[in-house]
A protein has these predicted regions:
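Short linear sequence motif anchored by a di-proline
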Residues: 1-158
Length: 158
């Protein structure tokens, strides 16, 4: 499981972006990204690789207090999508796995041990990583704007 991650503007991240033929802007880099936060993700649209911003939570609901705002659906913890459930037709990530895969760049990530207090931060030395991910497009009915949400594909817990 990935509980938090970092995306810092470094030579390694710049090299990764150049290798993928994309441009990552400094405002898309963040030192401590938590579930529900804004993340950069790489996806294809019309045969072109793009970097877009997404909420790190795959399933969003309309906020009843605001007609224009989508927020994480906390009923379903969907910031991560377990790899062993992607083939299950009843799984919430089943359709995005078949239709909208993406890459999520990172410089470091944090793993929890399940007790919510003990964490391990894995910092990549002179390297960068991309997580495999899933994304969804949501239409803001008032503005016509496309809003993205995404999750990281993870292994089942040990």
């Amino acid at each position: 499981m990935c509980g938090r991650f970092n995306l810092i503007d470094s030579p390694e991240i710049q090299w990764l972006c150049e290798s993928l033929g994309i441009q990552l802007y400094s405002e898309q880099c963040k030192p401590d990204i938590a579930p529900g936060g804004s993340i950069a993700f790489i996806h294809c649209k019309g045969g072109e690789r793009l970097v877009s911003e997404a909420t790190w939570w795959l399933f969003l609901d309309q906020d009843p207090d605001s007609s224009n705002y989508l927020k994480p659906n906390y009923k379903y913890a969907s910031f991560n999508s377990r790899s062993d459930k992607l083939s299950n037709k009843r799984a919430i990530a089943y359709t995005p796995y078949r239709e909208s895969r993406c890459l999520i760049p990172a410089s470091a990530f944090v793993e929890g041990l399940g007790d919510k207090k003990t964490y391990h931060k894995i910092e990549l030395e002179e390297s960068a990583i991309t997580f495999g991910g899933l994304y969804k497009e949501h239409l803001n009915r008032d503005t016509g704007e496309i809003i993205y949400s995404a999750s990281i594909i993870t292994l089942p817990p040990l």
